[in-house]
Amino acid sequence: MDGLKAAVAAHEAEAIALWRRWVQRETPSGDRRALEILGHAVAAAFESLAFEAEFVADGAGAHVILRGGDGQGTKRGQNRAGGWLLLGHLDTVYPRGTAAQMPWREQDGRFYGPGVMDMKGGIALAWLALRAMQDLNQAASTAVATGSSSPRHPPGAAAITILLVSDEETGSAGSRALTEKLARASEAVLVLEPGGGESGKLKTARKGIANFVLRAEGKAAHAGVDFFAGANAIIELARQAAGLAGWSQEARGITVNCGVIRGGTRGNVVPAEAELVVDARAWTARDLQAIETRIRALEAVDPKVRLTVSGGLNRPPMERSAEGTKLFARAQEAGRAVGVVIEECATGGGS
């Protein structure tokens, strides 16, 4: 694998330059124009590797599909079931102006800046890997042509599709169907999110996420003149939150977080309305469904208050599977070939 290391080293500086430009181009979620500009810049970089770009319009900003050939004559525009999908996103959580306060910089071998890891670094890394593979493929083809090697399927010759969405940080509402369609048509999906911990462990399991809003409708009243005629919506949700706090189970990895509560108008008025925002996570679809069933069955403690629940599943869990275990084993084998120890981890963060 000395050839691979040499190919990576040959293009590392170019990949870092792309990475820097992409980080300096701010792309907060919802800034459609900024996301479209970055999408075209990223597409141009991959077009230099003979990928073809397609832009799928969406309210959040265009999603970018980049299609590469398979090395055996398949056209890029064809449906290539069984290929590999590299999945990423263009948007970041940072508001516009962050780059001025936290500019791109390199210090002690580390790089800093808004979105430098999540996930413009992942996109740059994909570009570098594919550029290195292109060198290896060209070297293999030259060896065959000169008779110094026998014909073989060149490294990385599987059909590769890259999907970069514009709304991941806000829940992927507009890109979900597209992502699922491309993923189902693929042999494997590699997500370009940062690895786990300092060693960059591969994330082979993720918790699923469900988001809910509990709304309480009570009755307003003057706190000094007619207190007992009122029905306190905030108190109702405080009681509900206290109950939900007992649903988390550390041993099973189930968490139910009451993260935001809003309500009331002023201190001397019994609040008639309030809402509670709940984030629920679990390792399995079964546990997440059980939480949703329980939340939807909640009833108001105060009979004078009306309680409603909205929301539901945001991201399904990525449970460890036999197929995923096999894919990770392939990654470990590839790592050993170049002297890299690859480990796995599970994370509660969604993607």
Give the positions of each predicted feature:
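Acidic/histidine-rich catalytic neighborhood of metal-dependent amide-processing enzymes
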Residues: M119-V144, S149-A205
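Acidic/His- and Gly-rich active-site-bordering loop/insert found
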Residues: M1-P114
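Metal-dependent amide/peptide-bond hydrolase catalytic core
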Residues: M1-G3, A10, T27-P28, F55-A57, ...
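Short pre-catalytic strand/loop immediately N-terminal to key active-site residues, enriched for Gly-Thr
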Residues: Q107-D118, V341-C345
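Short glycine-aspartate micro-motif
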Residues: G83-L85, F111, E187-V191, V213
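Acidic-glycine-rich active-site phosphate/pyrophosphate-binding loop
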Residues: D91-Q107, L190, A205-R215, E333
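Predominant activation on well-ordered alpha-helical scaffold segments within soluble catalytic domains
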Residues: R20, A43, A124-R131, R176-T179, ...
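Short, conserved micro-motifs enriched in small and acidic residues
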Residues: F111-A124, A231-I234
